[in-house]
Amino acid sequence: MVRKNLGFKCFKDDYIPPLKARICFLEKDGFELELFEYDEPKDIPEDRKTPNSDLQTVGTKHVAFLTDNMNALKAGFVANGVDIAHEVRMEGNAVMFVRDPDGVLIEFIEK
């Protein structure tokens, strides 16, 4: 989802046997992301499947990206079959949450 929809490029892709996980390092415009894909991931609990309840869960698991054009971003997501979980306006800005293929919520804010 991150590569296809946000334009990040993978510059390193490793498999770590002790973790039983693949780690992909992505880059775009000087920003880097490190994503893990486990062989046997745990399912997301029901209370983490909606933005409001997920954001109340203690822990580091939230990421947000800024966009200049929410309509164009959403159109690309819809064309690629991305699950749009929630849309709202906050302080005059368009906000959208999408789910990645594993159900993890990712936030986008139009500035």
Outline where the language-model segments fall.
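Helix-adjacent hinge/juxtasegments
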Residues: 35-38, 53
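Short, charged, solvent-exposed linker or helix-capping segments at domain edges/interfaces
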Residues: 38, 45-48, 75-76
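Active-site/binding-pocket entry motifs
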Residues: 32, 39-42
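Core segments of cupin and vicinal oxygen chelate
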Residues: 1-32, 79
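Eukaryotic phosphotyrosine signaling hubs
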Residues: 60-62
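Vicinal oxygen chelate
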Residues: 14, 24-25, 33, 65, ...
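Short, P/G- and charge-enriched loop/turn segments at secondary-structure junctions
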Residues: 11-12, 48-54
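Loop/turn position at the start of each blade in beta-propeller repeats
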Residues: 19-21, 58, 91-93
